[in-house]
Amino acid sequence: MSFSMTRELYTAKYGPTVGDAVRLGDTDLFIEIEKDYTSYGDEVIFGGGKVIRDGMGQDPLISRAEGAMDLVITNAVILDYSGIYKADIGIKDGKIAAIGKSGNPRIMKNVDIIIGASTEIIAGEGLIVTAGGIDTHIHFISPQQVDVALTSGVTTLIGGGTGPAEGTKATTCTPGEWNIHRMLESVEGLPINVGLLGKGSTSSDVALTEQIRAGVIGLKIHEDFGAMRSVIDHSLKIADEYDVQVAIHTDTLNEFGFVEDTIDSINGRVIHTFHTEGAGGGHAPDIIKMGAFSNVLPASTNPTKPYTINTIDEHMDMLMVCHHLRRNVPEDVAFADSRIRKETIAAEDILHDMGIFSIMSSDSQAMGRIGEVITRTWQTADKMKKQRGKLQGDSGVGDNNRAKRYISKYTINPAIAHGINTYVGSVEVGKYADLVLWQPQFFGAKPNMIIKCGMVANSIMGDANASIPTPQPITYRPMYASYGLALQRSSITFVSKIAFELGVHKKLGLEKTVLPVFGIRNLTKQDMKHNCETPEITVDPQTYDVRVNGELITCEPAAELPLAQRYFLF
């Protein structure tokens, strides 16, 4: 005998299903459920009088060794580059083992995920699950950045530095073997995944090679240490040899050549361009043209995203501090002025919406906010919907194509760019369970829970002396994956393949999971999910107007944004 219930009641019990749309925070963006794998009538939920009990939704006889999961997230809405759908997520040994229908196969059909006595449950009803964010532009200036990143939904940091040294505050490099090894040891105590970038600003093949062999996953070229043609060529040559990425912040002053010279020096080899618009640094005024090339993986940093009425004014102060400039030196002021252009900043929003710019990152404490990568990504998506309308292929209520495009910018695409997409970057079977759970009304602003390798690392939590978990003050608090040996077992340090083969992690006594990066040097922009367009981009050298395939692209600055003061008092 079948039983029917209203859609409203079904959603209240089990979360939304096919035909329902979910609003993302207070934005104008909606996602529609494309498929539901949870099997109507056999849904599993936990609690008093609910389904997950022995002999009911829980298999009464199965052991962990026989296939019971370690953790199951029930009835979650998954928002991923690969789709927007509802499913249960089974996690075992810290990895996503299955996505589909969970329960007890002895009494239920089509069970993909077996719940047993070994299984913990997280109730995902009404929640959105995404992959943990990946920020590829980290200045490791202060370890306190990690708490801010985690509580924003970012679980992987890629960048360079050694602390609040002038080199680190400007250039995102961990230079030389000694510094690299000390930083690899230091991040052992941080409950987050880390990959380090070495200093690429040298023409010495030996100096570049020793850094890659020491454990960095890529090289960073920065104009403050020099972004000359020879530097670019040598870094890319050594990167090709060892299969690591090269990230570049090009020559703002055009002292050693123009953007065309940099493009010529790159010579078709894959490269990851930081803040490709240019306010964060790079050939003035036309570094943005590099977004057109198939070998360039272009990224933005978040201070310019989205373009608002305050963007231009804010940037001058940031730039003077971050690049060790002085307001009483005319040349320093001129340098700063050359980088801040409203025309290219406005165009950058549209380049993201068109899928031309592929990655969003922070530039943490160095002209960027580590805790706002995700927020500003969705603010940009919302602004573009309001100013440009729906993306092609989106119809009705849903904005699924736009949602997939923007979620890719801080999950799968940065993972691909740095050769870690086999391990993290999406909600897919076989990957480490770095997952973020969101209440829809807080999506993009404040996550509910952050899971690292299948264990809760951080979460909103009430007063620890209360009789239940929910009394005020509710704040983010580190959870058990942030303590003891569980910290090392729940986080990953990425190194170059050669460093892994040389056993650098063993020589240093690292306890974290250490994994090699690979598959980088044959990448093209076509590998960037939902963000692979390569049109012609031109910049007028007098007016700074940006054109895509001959068409002027610009937009008005936003005077008001979602995911802002409604969510953050301070």
Swiss-Prot record:
Its cofactor is Ni cation. The keyword Metal-binding applies. Keywords: Cytoplasm, Hydrolase, Metal-binding, Nickel. Substrate binds at residue 222. GO terms for biological process: urea catabolic process. One of its GO terms (cellular component) is cytoplasm. Ni(2+) 1 binds at residues 137, 139, 220, 363. InterPro entries: Amidohydro-rel, Metal-dep_hydrolase_composite, Metal_Hydrolase, Urease_alpha_N_dom, Urease_alpha_subunit, Urease_AS, Urease_asu, Urease_asu_c. Carboxylation allows a single lysine to coordinate two nickel ions. Binds 2 nickel ions per subunit. Its EC number is 3.5.1.5. The modification N6-carboxylysine is found at residue 220. Its main location: cytoplasm. Pfam families: Amidohydro_1, Urease_alpha. Pathway: Nitrogen metabolism; urea degradation; CO(2) and NH(3) from urea (urease route): step 1/1. NCBIfam families: PRK13207.1, urease_alph. Heterotrimer of UreA (gamma), UreB (beta) and UreC (alpha) subunits. Three heterotrimers associate to form the active enzyme. Belongs to the metallo-dependent hydrolases superfamily. Urease alpha subunit family. This is Urease subunit alpha. It comes from Lachnoclostridium phytofermentans (strain ATCC 700394 / DSM 18823 / ISDg). The gene is ureC.
